[in-house]
């Protein structure tokens, strides 16, 4: 129950370095519930292996999280999360810089 709305990002994406990996966190809102796809470059990522994908839902507000474990230099670069529902879609871009 709520007004239909296309995906809208609520804040800048946050990248947090963990002990052995990184966490990407994106806050957004939309209604109805979206389809969520994470990408590295143009390649869609799937859950499993070193990738853990989670979301928390509070009404129409979503926190989208992806964690990458055992990060190596090859993991650096551009990522995005695509969020799509029947009202539209949005993308949030994240850049993972791995310095020494």
Task: Give the label of every model feature segment.
Residues 1-100:
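Immunoglobulin-superfamily
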């Amino acid at each position: 129950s709520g007004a239909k709305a296309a995906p809208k990002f609520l804040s800048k994406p946050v990248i947090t370095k963990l002990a052995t990996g990184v966490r990407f966190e994106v806050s957004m809102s939309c209604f109805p519930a979206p389809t969520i796809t994470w990408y590295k470059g143009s390649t869609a990522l799937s859950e499993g292996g070193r990738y853990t994908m989670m979301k928390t839902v509070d009404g129409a507000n979503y926190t989208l999280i992806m964690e990458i474990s055992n990060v190596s230099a090859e993991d650096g670069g551009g990522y995005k999360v695509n969020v799509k529902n029947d009202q539209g879609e949005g993308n949030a871009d994240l850049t993972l810089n791995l310095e020494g």
